[in-house]
């Protein structure tokens, strides 16, 4: 195998030969097992300006508060009645523990109210252990919250709320107490997982690594992962991966897709979408019903009674749009231009795309989310 120092020079020479669409390997793939881990905890935020939990409706807040006091040797008398706390809120604390995080390092945390607190603005999180999915404590969180939202309420009941005042963040608010075991330095191979599975991209990664390091160093396991041989020494392994992750690879083109969000009317058409020969016309029918009741007045001395008689007016109006034709291999630009010429709204475009798909003329996957 070529020495690492020679690999660095070879990498610099090869990287200049790639096209403008090449992407770094670190941007399209990740190393198996090297990932962040989620942490979660439960704690109390104190120091709120009367915007804390209503303990009569959230008894767990009062229970947590009493448990905290008991740890300091303070016991609330049972006959003291219901304690009302207005400046305390029960919160959920969560964070992502980065890969290779070491004890003593800090991570950002997010704090969210789980009771009926109106706002966490101005509050401070008390010491909260943060656990992983295995139940072990990996970090301790504490600090003053940064809340971007606020709310205000007048005596007449008028209220204004900006952003979300019931959630905030503490930059560097958790101190790492335990490292997560990693299999990074185990074995003589590493697996690269593609962010988006694609057989073409996987093959190009294998070809590029083998071109640089020699035949058989990289092997594609499937369309989403590539296994590479790696040095056993931890220091050499770091140097080795620093070379691999900066290799530039031309990723394969994505499959042709049309994404439709029926709730928001958003339509995203991929670059490779094409349409077979087809003729399309689309019109909309608008039906308007107007209620115009009239008063029926009986004649004099007829003995009748005045009555309100309903009268409805129904009007139907249909908008006619000209027919437009798609030729063979029509591209995205031509589709958009043709639809814009007839003034189709997003809802109309959805109907047109669905009809083209049903007719077999849309050469793409139609995905409705």
UniProtKB/Swiss-Prot annotation:
It comes from the Bacteria. It is found in: Periplasm; Bacterial flagellum basal body. NCBIfam families: PRK05303.1 (NF003676). Pfam families: FlgI (PF02119). One of its GO terms (molecular function) is structural molecule activity. Assembles around the rod to form the L-ring and probably protects the motor/basal body from shearing forces during rotation. The keyword Signal applies. InterPro entries: Flag_FlgI (IPR001782). Keywords: Bacterial flagellum, Periplasm, Signal. Belongs to the FlgI family. This is Flagellar P-ring protein. The keyword Signal applies. One of its GO terms (biological process) is bacterial-type flagellum-dependent cell motility. Residues 1-22 form the signal peptide. GO terms for cellular component: bacterial-type flagellum basal body, distal rod, P ring; outer membrane-bounded periplasmic space. The basal body constitutes a major portion of the flagellar organelle and consists of four rings (L,P,S, and M) mounted on a central rod.
